[in-house]
């Protein structure tokens, strides 16, 4: 995968393959959680059940708020014979789970799959950023206002506040185009967003 391919890719699988061994387990698990939520979006009959519990427990686990045993118990119940513990495989399996709900009408199946792949590829970029241009946070940006703002965005999933974060970062002296553009983008932001994680010191 080249940088240009990364920026334009509409299939998350080669992107995940490129990231393998280059990123954290936490990031991969958060992507898998998004895929699980996409699956539940297509399956409202399961949205209040074990699938939703698995997504919520995984998010708590990656933030140290749930034990491995608690997470593993829910994971095994959900995935049954799917026994891989490697987060990379969970991310790949998540893609297949999200896409499988597109198999509703053979006449439009390929279009539906392509559309869902494009959604997932955009979320890969939101969570992992551009691996060809890593960005470091300047401590000068981490004012009390920005820290409070970004903490609230993460805790509340209040991604509608991202443009406000961009303005605050600019006021603090941030002129990084990648960060500011991402914050102001209308693309979907999710738990694990690379800018939010960067400012919170999460990997």
Regions from the PLM with identified roles:
Residues 1-203:
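Structured binding/interaction patches within domain cores
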């Amino acid at each position: 995968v080249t940088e240009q391919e990364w920026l334009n890719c509409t299939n998350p699988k080669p992107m995940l393959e490129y990231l393998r061994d280059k990123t954290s387990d936490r990031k991969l698990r958060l992507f898998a959680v998004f895929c699980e939520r996409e699956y539940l979006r297509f399956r409202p009959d399961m949205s209040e059940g074990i699938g939703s519990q698995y997504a919520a427990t995984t998010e708590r686990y990656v933030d140290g708020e749930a034990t491995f045993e608690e997470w593993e118990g829910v994971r095994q119940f959900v995935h049954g014979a799917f026994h891989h513990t490697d987060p990379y495989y969970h991310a790949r399996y998540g893609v297949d789970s999200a896409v499988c709900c597109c198999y509703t009408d053979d006449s439009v199946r390929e279009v539906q799959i392509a559309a869902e792949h494009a959604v997932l590829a955009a979320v890969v970029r939101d969570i992992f950023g551009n691996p060809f241009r890593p960005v470091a946070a300047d401590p000068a940006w981490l004012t009390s206002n920005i820290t409070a703002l970004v903490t609230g965005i993460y805790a509340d999933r209040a991604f509608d506040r991202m443009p406000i974060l961009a303005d605050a970062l600019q006021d603090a002296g941030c002129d990084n185009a990648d960060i500011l553009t991402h914050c102001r983008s209308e693309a979907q932001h999710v738990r694990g967003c690379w800018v939010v994680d960067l400012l919170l010191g999460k990997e």
